[in-house]
């Protein structure tokens, strides 16, 4: 996928697992362009539980990515982008399994 000059990639491994790649630099540039910075990170003990391939830990606050930025991110059917702390996270809608975490995008 290539949208607005930003590169992203979707890969499915041999077991059917999803691997998503959009670079930190691209995601950070979108956050800055859309004035979405200054978010506080999660406490370290909670942040370590935010791991690709695992469910989103219960009780972690997540926010929808504002539509102005969401429209510029790659779209993957069955997944949604969320803001968790200051990280950009791609989560499976039906299972809450984390497909991708891009740390400190909204710092």
What are these regions (language model features)?
Residues 3-107:
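Low-complexity segments
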């Amino acid at each position: 996928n290539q949208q607005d000059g930003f590169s992203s990639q979707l890969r499915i491994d041999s077991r059917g697992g999803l691997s998503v790649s959009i670079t930190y630099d691209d995601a950070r540039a979108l956050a800055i362009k859309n004035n979405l910075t200054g978010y506080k990170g999660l406490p370290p003990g909670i942040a370590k539980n935010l791991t690709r391939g695992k469910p989103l830990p219960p009780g972690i606050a997540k926010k929808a990515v504002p539509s102005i930025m969401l429209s510029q991110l790659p779209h993957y059917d069955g997944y949604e982008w969320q803001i968790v702390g200051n990280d950009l996270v791609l989560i499976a809608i039906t299972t809450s399994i984390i497909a991708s975490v891009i740390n400190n995008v909204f710092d």
